[in-house]
Each structure stands twice: as structure tokens, then as C-alpha cells.
Curated annotation (Swiss-Prot):
DNA-binding span(s): 18-37
PROSITE patterns cross-referenced by the UniProt entry: HTH_LYSR (PS50931)
The protein's name in its UniProt record: Uncharacterized HTH-type transcriptional regulator Rv0377
One GO BP annotation of this record: regulation of DNA-templated transcription
Species this chain originates from: Mycobacterium tuberculosis (strain ATCC 25618 / H37Rv)
Amino acid sequence: MTPAQLRAYSAVVRLGSVRAAAAELGLSDAGVSMHVAALRKELDDPLFTRTGAGLAFTPGGLRLASRAVEILGLQQQTAIEVTEAAHGRRLLRIAASSAFAEHAAPGLIELFSSRADDLSVELSVHPTSRFRELICSRAVDIAIGPASESSIGSDGSIFLRPFLKYQIITVVAPNSPLAAGIPMPALLRHQQWMLGPSAGSVDGEIATMLRGLAIPESQQRIFQSDAAALEEVMRVGGATLAIGFAVAKDLAAGRLVHVTGPGLDRAGEWCVATLAPSARQPAVSELVGFISTPRCIQAMIPGSGVGVTRFRPKVHVTLWS
């Protein structure tokens, strides 16, 4: 079995079709089918068959699917460790929700990376629905965001630890019609909602709140950051959903007003997710133990910026209107 064969088969399993796998891998349909055929011949197992409802996998095909993810992950991890050993540096890859990446990751990365001169941190932003896949495939070492056992799974392969509670609140400018009293649902639906990138995640907390409030999509504008959405609210009006501690200073200074009422607040909790302790690298275990300490919590809440020599951001694109 070759990595190319396993990569093609893993993509077919994850995406549910040869065509989708080919598009993701940049191969032709025939190329993916060739890799699958080679695996079928070597293992003497059909692996899957096509049905009217999609692909139906044999027991052996399902076993290969889980093993393929593990093997490819170990291959990638080994390559990283060899490179680290050659250059005398360690790399910690963090996947984070957009809200955590904007509001808490800077302070965390600066403080944690300052503990070791040989450590570089790479941060990428992903929806929490991808956390399990990213961890199991070893595409990242650790994932941080509003994860839960329902989204990550409770089969023991993923370690999950909550570490910081927060509130999502509704805020407006002081001159907004929502600033006084408890607003009626119709008035909420009539407002322009200036939203950060978290609103673009269909299964995220912000999207859930917006659905609960029945805010029409035509009244939602999504910006590249929560800070940009807040700036627009203070400049032209409208409402936004924000992490409570991130807007505490603006609320205290009177630049924003907290709007209360049914569905306008939501409690959340950030969690750290990794492979089981026996399978993760030492730097991950260090971060898991460090992230819930009072010193680290204090660093994450205000956010103190990131030293550019320590932080390697991955390129990602956010679309906004």
C-alpha cells in the first residue's frame, strides 16, 4: 500500500464519491479509481460498492478507512519530527475557532511560546465540525474552540478538556432603537446585524442564535473579523453578537450598550481537544496542562499581541459582504 493509494481511498470515504475525491486531490476520476483498484487487488476485498443511496462499505473497507487516516497521520507526524530534529526546533500546530483565534489565541501563543526558545506555533482557523477530522488525521496537534462530545465524539480517541467559560451578548451603539428596554422580536429582525466570521459557520453558536431570533439573511452582514463588525456598529449603527469580555471596555466607556432579552445572550465554553495523552507529542501535553492556569487565562482574556518570530499563521480566506 502506498501513501497515494491510502490518501485517495481516505478521500473517497470522507467525501462519499470518487469524483469529489478526485476534485479535492487534483486527480482525474480514473486516477482515483486506479488507486482504489490497486488496494482492492492487494487486500483481496472490494472495499465498497455503489448503491442508489451512495457508497456501501464492506467491513474490511471500513477498517481500512480508519487505518488509512492513522497511517497517513503518522507519516505526516514522522516527517515533521524528522525536520524538527534536523533544525533543532519544534512546531505546534493549533486549529481554532474564529472567535478564539481573534480574541484569546494571541495572548495564549505569546505566553506559551515564551516558555521555550525552540518552539514555533502555527495557527489555522477551522469550523469546530472539522476538529475531529483534523486531529485524527494529525493535520493539527491540538484544536481549541466551543467543542463538545457531541461534535468531537466520545469513543475515547479524542481527549477533550474545557478551560474557559464566556458569554455571547448582543450589543448596539448608544443611539440605537434597541438600546432602551427589551426589544420586540420584530424590531430585532428589522435591524442590520454586523457580524464576525463566526456567523458564517452554519452549526456555530452565532448562527444558532441568529436562527433562534429569526434574523433574515438579508439583514446580516458578515465581516472579516469581530473587530470590524464592532467598528461598523459604532460607525453606522445596527447590532452585533460579541464575546462579553472582548467588549467589556467599550461597554464600561459607554461606546456600546448591552441589549438584554430572550435569545440575546448565550453561555459558551472553550475546550481543548487532542489525541489521547499516550499518542500526542510532549508540547501538546504541556499546553493542555498550561492552558487552564490562572496566568494563562489572564493572558488570553485581554490578548497582548503575538511576537512575529513565534507565530506562523496559516493562510485562510474569509468571505464577507
